[in-house]
């Protein structure tokens, strides 16, 4: 408690009275000294006048001067007497003001006593009402405790049954893992066989490319020989026509011997020129043509044999591909079954395998139908089916083994580039007027791309080199620098330039054909890419859903803990105080908070049960956060509230701080234990959710019931802790009441000592005033020098008295406001505002002293005589102690104390 308010007021009152009396006495003494000095001067002047009577003639001028000085001194003495009368009038005015102040103080004291009595009656009524409410809450909490114990026993039995089911599921999972490992080993063996078959296919591709080059070379030589034969036939026809013309001329007119000799010479010259111009005879050309035709027949026979061997290899490859697709479909079905059992999601795994199977069958039929037309079309379809199956195999491998996502994205990019190249090749082959050479070149261009998608980057650069080597007739103008372009664009540009060189067409025309083909195939490629992205993002979606479900479970646990704390009825006065403090800090009403949390909790459950989407969940979350932000305020207000509450409770930190710290530490330790138990149960819940294939919803509900059971037990423990804290606070209140009684006794002792001190000071003041009266009567001579300092003490006295009155009124106003603002804290303490009562008693003591002084100051001599007042403070303290004793006797023993 603060013991400094009333001694300060006592000292201020004593200082004002003593200083005022002392200043008046000092002024009177000073005036007496001046009168004595003036009397001495007059005596000396008279002596000098007697001495100088003999020298009257010489001292006439000096005598006149002294006479003038005496006249002036008399005037000053009259002025001093006038000032004395004025000061007496002022003192009478101050006495009247003092009487008015005393009357006001009496009125204020009566009003304070009335307010104190009203506050005490209100506090007693509120205390009795709170006791009745606490008793009813204790009875309800006992019933709830019994019900919670029964529920705890039932949930423990259910937990044992669930543990047995978990063990059975673990055994089933081990068996499934063994089957999965066997399937993985068989899949690896099939992959090795597929790699060997692919290698054989590539060897056959290389041989076919060489055969195609040889056939092209032989075709070019045959074309050249055919052109020469046609030229020779034209020359022979021309000669025959000329011979016929000459014969006709000869028949018309027969020449002479000279003309005949001349003509024979010309014919010989023409024959020589013809022999020199054509060293090989037409017979030799016909022999070469026959040889070339025989070679063409042999090459066609070899092509037929190679085609038959290729058909056999393709049939074998198709058989192995079908087996691979079947095993892949089985593996995907098994994987989907595992994922459904672990996460409860439905995936259609057989879709991609069926698509790949259909593509492969379509490629086989296309190969059989178009075998007679061109080998390039069949190879393009076979490459597309192979790329499809290769992509499906990569996707299945990534889903089983779990390769990084960057590799999957790279694979998708490579596959898209290969599809573009295949579409370019198909458009070039399907153009009207294109030769089989173009189809073979397109096959040779797409072959390295497949190598690029299956091998590393170094092998891809080697294949790009082979593309250049396949086109020896290409001009150096068409070469492209590979440093400035990516690998995929480099390969596409090579294929386009080779097609341009072979067909001898413009680049714009080739690009226009490619644009048309891409626009026609755009829709189909978009649908296939969409399906591929769907199959690729299944695993990512499952991971995201798993993470979202975990985070939502955590949010649910936090919200359920908060709602349980808010819905729990407080069973004692201390917990009631704490809950009210929390509501003040956060500005949340319990009903509003519980409704908001229940709505958000329902949204979380709907999201987990797939009844709502992420949009609705995000809306609920944003609304909850907005509500929380709108109902919070700064921590500075919280600190001020805490200080006010501590002042209201008269918190004794030196005595109960260590006890409170120990209790808080115990509460924190027990809360940590409960939190670890909740975390272990949440981990068990997550494990059950991951392991159970069929009974996921039922297991989740049981685990949530177990978690609720644990939270209920935690709430029961918190109730017990709050009850212990309540008992501790009641003991502290009792100790504080005892301490208050001791303080009251010390205040009474100090009041007695104060009265004794005032008696001693009053006797001293009486002696000083008597001395002043004696000196005033003895000194009737006027004062020579009037001073203006006598008005200053009176002004100081009036200013001090007015400031004291204003200060007491302000304190009275503040105490009235504090009473109006803090009735709840006074009711909770059960002491009825002990600090305000303490201040009121101090003010009452000061008012009693002032009233005694005012009664004693009715006489003009300012005599202060103390008077004893019957009742007053002692009766007030007796009332307070009687109420405290009644409150102690009415306390009900706590049933949970043991």
Curated annotation (Swiss-Prot):
Matches recorded under Pfam families: FPP (PF05911)
Membrane-spanning residues: none
Coiled-coil regions, chain positions: 23-224, 287-320, 703-764
Skewed-composition ranges (Low complexity): 434-459
Chain intervals for the UniProt region annotation (Disordered): 429-482, 693-723, 777-835
Keywords for the protein's UniProt record, in alphabetical order: Coiled coil
Stretches with biased composition (Polar residues): 460-469
Positions with biased composition (Basic and acidic residues): 808-822
Subunit structure: Interacts with WPP/MAF proteins.
Family under the similarity heading: Belongs to the FPP family.
Protein name in the entry: Filament-like plant protein 7
Record organism: Arabidopsis thaliana
